[in-house]
């Protein structure tokens, strides 16, 4: 769920801890790298924090998932339009949302793969 006019955040320029980047990159990798976890550590962390929501995620329809993501995307763009440029505040504000989105995507992908095989 993205804004076509800015190519999903690729045209939205910003500074992340002093380095030039774009909004898409922040959400693709920078928020994840912010915690400094290895992949194994992050997997365990996400399971520990969000595992209790697994059944709820699996019950969500494709439409509900899309609508949830649409609202998250809308909130990100609204926040960005008034953002002061403080990277620490941005990370504090959005890292949990990014983590939940990752967890939700992983659970839904696993479900689809299990359904296929």
State the predicted function of each range.
Residues 3-117:
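C-terminal accessory segments of proteins
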């Amino acid at each position: 769920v993205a804004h076509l006019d800015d190519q999903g955040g690729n045209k939205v320029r910003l500074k992340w801890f002093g380095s030039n980047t774009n909004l898409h990159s922040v959400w693709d990798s920078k928020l994840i790298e912010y915690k400094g976890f290895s992949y194994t550590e992050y997997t365990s962390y996400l399971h520990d924090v969000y595992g209790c929501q697994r059944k709820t995620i699996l019950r969500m329809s494709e439409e509900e998932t899309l609508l949830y993501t649409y609202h998250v995307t809308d909130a990100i763009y609204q926040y960005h339009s008034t953002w002061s440029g403080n990277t620490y505040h941005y990370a504090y504000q959005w890292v949990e949302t990014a983590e939940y989105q990752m967890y939700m995507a992983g659970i839904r992908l696993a479900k689809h793969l299990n359904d296929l095989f």
